[in-house]
């Protein structure tokens, strides 16, 4: 295993590498030291339940889940066999895909945090203006009167693509004026889709951090504008954290035990950190020390792992060590991590891995061939973590995971893909 200094050197060399967090401690102790609590996740979960009648009405594809924005958990045994045979993996137990790539409304994990942040702001405005009480039927938010009210307000967000889609789609459905500030990495089809929904898209020839800053500045000019801050938002974070509770129920439905003798290993693609950080926080709340969460980042944009391993959090960016921040995994093309997320997860995330663009496409193609499932390149990052961890015999032994490896449940969190147009899918699969 590499120490943190050696790992940063591997990052500089653009090597696919692994970092195991030396600061991870007992979940109970680590969670007790954090300002966010189970009560915060309770409140977020309850708010999503209150808005479910509205979501069901406006987004009929959510009807099967009663207006909840949720995705399937699918065992991918053929992909597990492929990884073992073709990549030298030693994955025992079961391998699952958490298909946030197929989440309704926005087709990515950002439908969790992004939609929740919009709904939280919406409820705050509605309560302050006495439009509703919490016990009311929130399907009234779909009426013309409510849409007219929210049309007085504007939402701003900086995005590489998927967060902009979730906030743009949900914001427009509620009647807001929405402006998405897009970095140079954003895919054209995502901009086109937003504009088709009536969302204003401002394009910048610079990276994600610059787009976020521009969004922050624009929102500050108007008291009726609200900036959804991907770098610092507690609301986004809590929206993602709710996912862990839903996952717990899905695992129980499939008779998957999670405890010390049946460890849960979760591999999550990471950009600025909000989605993986929130999910990690939720998983540790639900499963404690039985959950082991690993972040996966591109070799050119490993911002969160760089911040965690160096201890500098958002005081360092990938360009500081000679990397470009450019990657085909557009959702992960972030150069500087969230300091808020880094501080929150520094004692609960188990580690992380970096992956080359080449291997993202290899795994994208293999998943489609073996399971007939399509995800976008960013969503494939977790496979590299599962493969690499399975080969780290010293770490597995020292961490105690090796003793229960045969009983492990592995979850690769697929973060996006459902909205990718057919022409783009064909290009990805041909790459």
Language model region names:
Residues 1-431:
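PLP-dependent amino-acid enzyme catalytic core
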